[in-house]
Amino acid sequence: HRCTFCIIPFARGNNRSLAMGAIADQVRALVAKGYREVVLTGVDICSYGTDLPGNPTLGHLVRRLLKAVPELERLRLSSLDPAAMDDELFRALAEEARLMPHLHLSLQAMDDMVLKRMKRRHSRDDAYKVAERARALRPDLVLGADLIAGFPTETQAMHDNTLAAVRDLDLVHLHVFPYSERDGTPAARMPTVDVPERKARAAELRDAGAANLARFLATSIGQTVPVLIERDAMG
């Protein structure tokens, strides 16, 4: 898939999936070295398997890894395209306790016209439905998202739609980027938003995410849950 703002496909070419057995071997080796959590990552992990025999999906890979490496304590997923999450992945989310209750969605925007001009495959309503379905299966689920602020042609009203969705969906972990032109991409030829306005809109989105995170942390006070300490530092 090629979004209008993204230069990555031009640099990296088409997706190339590792065989499930090879991934399981890598995870098994990491666990043997003492790693307790593995994060599956890639340019577009929801497209996993489209170039492999039998077309296994990301959901099938998750199931295979958790079965093949029972010693793995925690499996986490990196950024997910909400238009390409398969049914097996949702079933794994509901049934596999070792799959972390955290989904990071590659939303980029939450206004339908902006999404269309980005050439994204999901609509605003699609994203809401994905969040609703996932939370129904996993009530303790935490959602994050990637967002681009000030995409070409984005009006204040379009930005406000994205800002409202951050609050509606209670997105607590945001990766927000002011739009940055990439030569050779279709978006670079579109009418632009002034750079200071892009930065201001990005700050608004980050502030909304920070407020959501503060509320989430407040609800966690008094709970006892297993955690993974990642570094020797406070905070």
Residue ranges and their predicted role:
Residues 3, 23, 40, 77, ...:
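Conserved, mostly hydrophobic/aromatic
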Residues 137, 157, 161-206:
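C-terminal, non-catalytic macromolecule-binding modules
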